[in-house]
Amino acid sequence: METELNNKNDKFKYLKITTVICLIALVLSFAGCGASGSSGSSGSTGAAKSAGSTIIKGSENIKPISVSSFFKNVGKNTGIYKMIHNPTPEEIAEEKASKEAMEIAKEEQTAQAAADLAKHPVKGWQRLIMLAIGFLIVYLAVVKGFEPLLRIPIGFGTILVNIPGAGMGDGPDGMLHIIYNAGVGNEFFPMLIFMGIGAMTDFGPLIANPKMALLGGAAQLGVFATLFGVAAMNFIPGIDYNMKQACAIAIIGGADGPTSIYVSGKLAPEMMAVIAVAAYSYMALVPMIQPPIMKLLTSKKERQIKMNQLRPVSKTEKTLFPLLLLVVTILLLPPAAPLIGMLAFGNFIKEVGIVQRLSKTVENELMNIVSILLSLGVGSQMTPEKIMHANSLGIIVLGLLAFAVATAGGLIMAKIMNLFLKEKINPLIGSAGVSAVPMAARVANKVGMAEDPTNFLLMHAMGPNVAGVIGTAIAAGVFISTYGM
């Protein structure tokens, strides 16, 4: 009885915290809308929403293609094609022009942001609100235990960058500006984080039951389905996303903070701070978000399904797995190789067993140092001109949608697999297909044990959980190869 009461109190506590966060985002979005409306931009926004305009900016440049053309283009983006095909002078010139155009676009975006800031300087009350948000993030991390290892430095970064006159986020000598340029804005820190994740990850459950990779892949439904949510959100006055921003928001559905930072840094750096905070917030809220969806989509009988113990996995299998994973990625999806490559490297030095000093350093000291710097760099982007906008509220809503659909995708795939499998799998482990390791696996185990205290699903759920890490990295590679290359 006391346990049930504590669970209810925890759920009520999480609900209150989530409500507070949404209300703050709502206030900030209206403040941003009011500021933009007073500057006379409402007319342009209305024009953008006209019936003749496209739903997502940038999609008007995407020409319809046939199925055969689609697969032909996919084939040209594989590592196999690039290794055996000698590029023509026209292709080299086109690639060079594309890179130059991207650099010009970045410079124009930076110049436009500086011009907007000069035209509409940050007001004192806006800095005060951002300071309050920074302290709120620290409070949630310390008192409520919401991802404290990351949220504390993010909160302090938010506080430090918004101190009037301190200049910690100003270039070229501000400390937070240096941290951001050194590792956050150029993907260096997220790569190191993935190396650390690899050193801490055990792929044994996935190797023992490779079918679980399907559940990790199905959970990416939330990532791609969110693109439709972005299209719908663009009908709301004051919200206006382009295709790159849509992809950066959608990756929140993978429940992977480093990947969200990596993709947003590549495609939508102006939204990185909100996307990172949203991603880590929903990762912390896994015990609240997932169980209702799990119970809604499964029956009591399905939740009580017991699975056979996993077979032992040899050291040779564990050592070869990261190498095989890297080779497949190189051959089929090179844009995902940076993330997968660092994950494979970290896991290989752990499993090979002859460089324990390296693996322990990557897993502990290096991971901790980079986490601090990465989080401070993300916090340095929590400035009024980037946060106080209706798009910030949209990110919070769409992130929750992505996470919920990803959970549902894994559950539904598990139920579909049971139609063809002799040895049934418990659909609850499908919810662990999101890459919140190991939180999602623990939630699946907890919900299963609530139905049957003797039903231990943790190791089974770790299979789709680590597959979700790989799946999210692959989804990131698809987005970057499509819109960021």
Say what each PLM segment does.
Residues 119-130, 178-193, 245-251, 334-344, ...:
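Structural signature of hydrophobic alpha-helical transmembrane segments
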Residues 181, 185-186, 195-200, 214-225, ...:
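Alpha-helical membrane segments and immediately flanking helix-loop junctions
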Residues 142-151, 170-180, 201-215, 355-364, ...:
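Interfacial helix-loop-helix linkers and transmembrane-helix boundary segments
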Residues 206-227, 384-410, 461-465:
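Entry/N-cap segments of selected transmembrane alpha helices
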Residues 270-288, 398-406, 429:
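Alpha-helical transmembrane segments
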Residues 16, 30-123, 238:
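Low-complexity, proline/glycine-enriched hydrophobic segments characteristic of transmembrane helices
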Residues 278-354:
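Membrane-embedded hairpin module used as a gating/binding unit in multi-pass transport
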Residues 37, 93-96, 326-410:
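Transmembrane helical segments that form the transport core of multi-pass membrane transport proteins
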